[in-house]
């Protein structure tokens, strides 16, 4: 989302497509940390994977969305950091909730749909594919598929859930403006109020493009809050992703993020200012999956920074959920045929947590 909020990218030969797992919190979270103990050191590095690099292709950076509640003039001294209890390894396979807990989430969603579950099936960890040093032994459930007559409900081991509408039609056209998209989301919020269960919705939409210029629009909503920190958490961890049908007045599927329910709060960590983070970025102190050959030979300069925001990395491949300043940097032209006017932006991260709490600062090559 995020809301690009949270993201993995395909190889450059395919379209640069930001993947967001979205939704709402369905079960309680947080056990308070021991305030008498010192905050443990954190590892700010993260796995890039083998799926290319994080980036966007846009005609204008404004198309990336503006619903992030963080602003540069926001005064934040600390932000919470969480241990991801569903983490297994760099593959991101989520294993934490019991089979009964997975079923409980599915039953709750079915009740909001006024539907009865008629079949269930659990996907389990294959012992032959376990990575070294994993905490798993094999056979653990990492996903539940629950079917009703009209819906298929998928619940992952970290609480994330997807509802697929078995009667879905053709997906809604991606070629919509931001205002058209917001109107569509408003219609869906009214029609599916019981399922979506959002009291104070913040509507969020953004798009990116394929190399040929085909627009790919995303539709999201999250719960507003008067507390700025809680609103930041809602934006990063509690998005609801909507896929409209062709008419725009019905849903093809909806996704709910719930991973914050499978965490332990480590503590509230002091964070650096955005100005300090930007200085680190310009000094080359950043984390990125962008290959160096795509960056201009002069490195990152002020005029290359197209967008700045504060986010949490929330994918299940992360052992720790911690905040980062994220920067979108305009990359140099690549040797790939692209639609006229289309620009490539690479994503660069600077940890928001103060350096004295990072074990790997400042070496992140």
Go through each PLM region and give its residues.
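Preferential activation on post-signal-peptide N-terminal prodomains/segments
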Residues: 27-233, 260-262
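Single-pass transmembrane signal-anchor helices and their membrane-water interface zones
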Residues: 1, 8-33
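Short linear interaction motif-like sites in intrinsically disordered regions of transcription factors
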Residues: 7-10, 71, 207, 365
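Segments that shape or occlude catalytic/ligand-binding pockets
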Residues: 182-336, 342
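Short hydrophobic short-linear motifs embedded
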Residues: 2-6, 56-59
């Amino acid at each position: 989302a995020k809301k690009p909020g949270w993201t993995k990218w395909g190889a450059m030969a395919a379209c640069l497509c930001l993947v967001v797992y979205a939704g709402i919190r369905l079960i309680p979270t947080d056990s308070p940390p021991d305030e008498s103990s010192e905050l443990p050191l954190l590892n700010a590095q993260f796995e890039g994977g083998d799926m290319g690099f994080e980036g966007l292709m846009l005609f204008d950076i404004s198309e990336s969305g503006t619903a992030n509640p963080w602003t540069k003039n926001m005064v934040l001294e600390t932000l919470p950091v969480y241990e991801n209890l569903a983490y297994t390894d760099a593959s991101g396979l989520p294993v934490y909730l019991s089979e009964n807990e997975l079923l409980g989430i599915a039953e709750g969603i079915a009740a909001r749909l006024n539907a009865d579950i008629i079949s269930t099936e659990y996907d389990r960890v294959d012992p032959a594919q376990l990575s070294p040093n994993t905490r798993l032994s094999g056979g653990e459930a990492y996903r539940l598929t629950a079917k009703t007559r009209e819906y298929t409900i998928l619940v992952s081991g970290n609480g994330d859930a997807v509802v697929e509408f078995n009667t879905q039609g053709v997906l809604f056209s991606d070629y919509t403006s931001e205002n058209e998209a917001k109107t569509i989301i408003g219609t869906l919020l009214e029609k599916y109020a019981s399922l979506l269960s959002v009291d104070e919705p913040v509507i969020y939409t953004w798009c990116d493009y394929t190399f040929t210029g085909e627009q790919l629009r995303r539709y999201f909503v999250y719960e507003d809050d008067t507390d700025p920190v809680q609103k930041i958490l809602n934006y990063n961890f509690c998005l609801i992703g909507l896929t409209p049908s062709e008419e725009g007045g019905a849903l093809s599927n909806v996704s709910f993020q719930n991973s914050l329910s499978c965490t332990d709060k480590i503590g509230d960590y002091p964070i650096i200012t955005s100005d300090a983070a930007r200085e680190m970025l310009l000094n080359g102190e950043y984390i990125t999956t962008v290959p160096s050959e795509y960056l201009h030979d002069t490195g990152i300069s002020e005029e290359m920074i197209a967008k700045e925001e504060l986010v949490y990395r929330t994918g299940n491949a992360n052992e720790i959920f911690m905040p980062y300043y994220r920067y979108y940097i305009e990359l140099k032209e690549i040797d790939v045929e692209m639609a006229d006017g289309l620009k490539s932006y690479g994503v660069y991260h600077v940890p928001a947590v103060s350096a004295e709490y990072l074990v790997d600062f400042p070496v992140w090559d």
